[in-house]
């Protein structure tokens, strides 16, 4: 199944996803829970708003009966989030215009990604238990968090707010990260 988004606001994306898939949504304060329809498989996606409009935590836990391709249209750099995504189980493939390498990851890896104004897509592969945890923030919040820390110079060189371009960095989840992920999940 393919789902395409044209909206950039999370609430509008949520409505588009519900309309295209038949997913049900439960809202409770700062937390949204999407329950996947049986036609897709089973599982849910939780989103927790940590800071209104600029900082969210997403937890994907599902097993799909058919692969799900989610495509996002090009958007302004200011509305394209900076994402730190951890892969706890399963396989995820994707592509971002402007990045030559395949964008894919398996359990035990994490990625740091920014799509800038480029279109992108991600495919959640059927037949596998997929569990991911992602931290999503605005470019401005990310820049504010970097501050003047010299240890963050790699990101500061890439993260020029006037010349933002797509970025993808894959790494191995450390034991400390894995413990934190388990605490988030349980």
Residue ranges and their predicted role:
Residues 4-5, 91-186:
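Alpha-helical bundle regulatory/interaction domains
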Residues 45, 60, 84-86, 135, ...:
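Generic structural hydrophobic/aromatic packing signal, biased to beta-strands
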Residues 48-49, 72-78, 85, 91-94, ...:
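Short, charge-rich binding segments
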Residues 62-64, 78-99, 109:
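Glycine- and acidic-residue-biased ligand/ion/polar-headgroup-sensing regions
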Residues 29-31, 36-37, 43-44, 87, ...:
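Mixed-charge, polar/low-complexity N-terminal
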Residues 1-80:
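N-terminal low-complexity or simple alpha-helical regulatory segments
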Residues 8, 62-67, 87-91, 138-142:
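Generic structural motif
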Residues 54, 79-83, 129-134:
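Extracellular structured ligand-interaction cores
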């Amino acid at each position: 199944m393919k789902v395409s988004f044209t909206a950039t606001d999370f609430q509008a994306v949520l409505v588009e996803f519900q309309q295209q898939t038949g997913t049900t949504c439960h809202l409770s304060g700062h937390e949204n829970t999407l329950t996947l329809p049986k036609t897709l498989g089973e599982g849910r996606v939780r989103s927790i708003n940590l800071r209104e409009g600029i900082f969210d935590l997403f937890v994907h836990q599902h097993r799909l009966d058919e692969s799900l391709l989610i495509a996002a249209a090009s958007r302004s750099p200011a509305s394209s989030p900076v994402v730190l995504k951890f892969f706890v189980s399963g396989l995820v493939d994707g592509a971002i215009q402007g990045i030559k390498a395949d964008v894919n990851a398996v359990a035990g890896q994490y990625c740091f990604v920014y799509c800038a104004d480029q279109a992108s897509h991600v495919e959640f592969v059927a037949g596998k238990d997929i569990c991911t945890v992602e931290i999503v923030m605005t470019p401005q919040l990310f820049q504010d968090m970097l501050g003047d820390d010299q240890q963050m110079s790699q990101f500061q060189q890439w993260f020029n707010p006037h010349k933002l371009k797509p970025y993808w960095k894959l790494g191995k989840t450390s034991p400390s990260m894995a413990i934190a992920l388990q605490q988030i999940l349980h």
